[in-house]
Regions:
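Terminal substrate-recognition subdomain of acyl/acetyltransferases
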Residues: 34-45, 94-132
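A conserved beta-strand-loop-helix scaffold within acyl/acetyltransferase catalytic domains
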Residues: 18-51, 55-59
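A short linear-motif detector with a strong N-terminal bias
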Residues: 8-11, 23, 30-36, 71-75
Length: 132
């Protein structure tokens, strides 16, 4: 079963966040695994209500090689990042990986002036905890 969870190794987390210039308090690395086998990760930053995807890395090769398997993994990481962002107060999502803009546009993101964005509510349903 494929899972995506925030990284547990704090040393690796800090190294990767530094590499991708993630600096917000709620920034993290979301690690995708199939059982114990790591498939990849997304480096995300949360700044002023925006979730920024700083990088996506796949262990089977380049995330920019958009074969069918990689598209599934990138989509999985994108949706997990949106869920993480929604749970941490983000309302907007932005892809910062220029090579993946066309993929994200195919998922509903809007590309304007080199910035690829989408409201998080277009990806995940945000429930009102006070609504019964």
């Amino acid at each position: 079963m494929i899972t995506v969870k925030p990284i547990e190794d704090n040393i690796r987390k800090e190294q990767l966040l530094s590499r991708y210039h993630c600096s917000a308090a709620d920034s993290t690395i979301l690690v995708m695994k199939d059982g114990v086998c790591e498939l990849g990760y997304a480096a995300i930053d949360l700044i002023q209500g925006k979730l920024l995807i700083r990088n996506i890395f796949l262990t089977n090769g380049s995330a920019q090689e958009l074969n069918a398997e990689n598209k599934i993994y990138i989509d999985f990481l994108m949706r997990a990042a949106a869920s993480y962002g929604a749970n941490h107060g983000a309302y907007q999502m932005e892809n910062c990986v220029e090579e993946l803009h066309s993929f994200f546009v195919s998922k509903g993101f809007v590309l304007e002036h080199g910035i690829c964005t989408i409201p998080i509510s277009k990806i995940v349903h945000v429930c009102n905890p006070h609504h019964t």
